A protein has these predicted regions:
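Alpha-helix N-cap and loop-to-helix initiation/capping positions
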Residues: 79, 162-170
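Conserved C-terminal portion of the radical SAM core fold
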Residues: 170-189
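Conserved Radical SAM active-site core
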Residues: 19, 24-146, 154-156
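A general structural signal for well-ordered alpha-helical packing
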Residues: 136, 140, 168-175
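Auxiliary Fe-S-binding modules of radical SAM enzymes
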Residues: 1-19, 183-189
Length: 189
């Protein structure tokens, strides 16, 4: 496939055998870790933890990344959408309060395959906020919570630290789309 998933629209050739683009990932899914995670935001972790699935690679490549080994060193295992679904269902059966998809943007088409049927727990899209509105629209009805980490409001640091001078423009439009889909942030029981 020629990739246009994220705002970079890099048109990289991504096949099962060939990784490409800024994310340096092949077509298909690469997962670094899946686990019950007690240390996400408390409203996501609940009492049993969030079912976190950490995807490999990233469409931003920030120099300050807290998950650098996962994001920059291509650490992880290639899996199918069916296997991702099994992982999600297993985390739900372990009592996960939600399924927290961490840095999933560059794998959107394959994540969508895994989310074809309802899961029985809310799905969290935990990203760097650097998203295309068109890509987010494909997630409508599949994702219940968006958790974008808004990183920059100014072009210069976005360019210098993530090579994404259009970051704020793309992220602002993406957040508007996220709110359109699921509504504004609310805390309840």
């Amino acid at each position: 496939m020629r990739c246009k998933i994220c705002p970079r629209r890099c048109n990289a050739e991504r096949t099962a055998e060939k990784a490409g683009g800024v994310c340096r990932m092949p077509a298909g899914l690469v997962v670094a870790r899946a686990m019950l995670h007690m240390w996400e935001e408390p409203v996501l972790s609940g009492k049993n933890g969030a079912g976190c699935i950490f995807f490999s690679g990233c469409n931003l490549g920030c120099v300050f990344c807290q998950n650098g080994r996962i994001s920059h060193e291509n650490f992880g295992k290639v899996i199918t959408p069916a296997h991702l679904r099994e992982i999600m269902e297993d985390l739900v059966s372990q009592g996960a309060h939600c399924i927290d998809l961490v840095t999933p943007t560059h794998f959107t088409p394959w994540v969508l395959e895994a989310l074809e049927k309802p899961l029985g727990a809310p799905v969290v899209w935990n990203s760097g906020g650097y998203e295309r509105v068109e890509t987010l629209r494909t997630l409508e009805g599949k994702v219940q919570i968006y958790l974008p980490d808004l990183k920059y409001a100014m072009e210069r640091p976005a360019r210098e630290l993530s090579a994404a001078p259009d970051y704020f423009e793309a992220a602002a439009a993406a957040i508007d789309e996220m709110v359109r889909q699921v509504g504004a942030y609310q805390i309840g029981d």
